[in-house]
A protein has these predicted regions:
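A preference for well-ordered globular domain cores
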Residues: 1-106
Length: 106
């Protein structure tokens, strides 16, 4: 290989760590869920909290530290569905990127 070919190969090498970080950031941006005038981040912690509550109406702090009154079952369903869909898509995209060897295959 000529030096120019080696340089081109090095320039087009796929940066797996950067791509993985970008996929994670994109997924986390999609986990934001508006509900009942508040903004919530879908997470396993929130899902567990809502699942453990027995009340139909909960008062919960949103991501902007404001208290929100919400229907627990509706919020739980929305948060669970959002989390499952986003993480599933993130997983699929990560599996695709694991098969990529060069940047021009992205």
């Amino acid at each position: 290989m000529t030096p120019d070919q080696l340089k081109l190969l090095a320039d087009t090498e796929f940066d797996r760590a950067a791509h993985k970080k970008n996929l994670r950031e994109a997924a986390h941006a999609q986990l934001t869920v508006p509900f009942a005038g508040g903004l919530f981040i879908a997470s396993p912690t929130l899902i567990a909290f809502l699942g453990a509550c027995n009340e139909d109406i909960v008062y919960i702090e949103d991501s902007y530290n404001n208290p929100v009154q919400a229907d627990r079952v509706e919020l739980l369903n929305l948060i669970s569905t959002t989390y499952r869909d986003v993480v599933s898509n993130w997983y699929d995209e990560l599996q695709k990127s694991n098969r990529i060897r060069r940047a021009n295959n992205v």
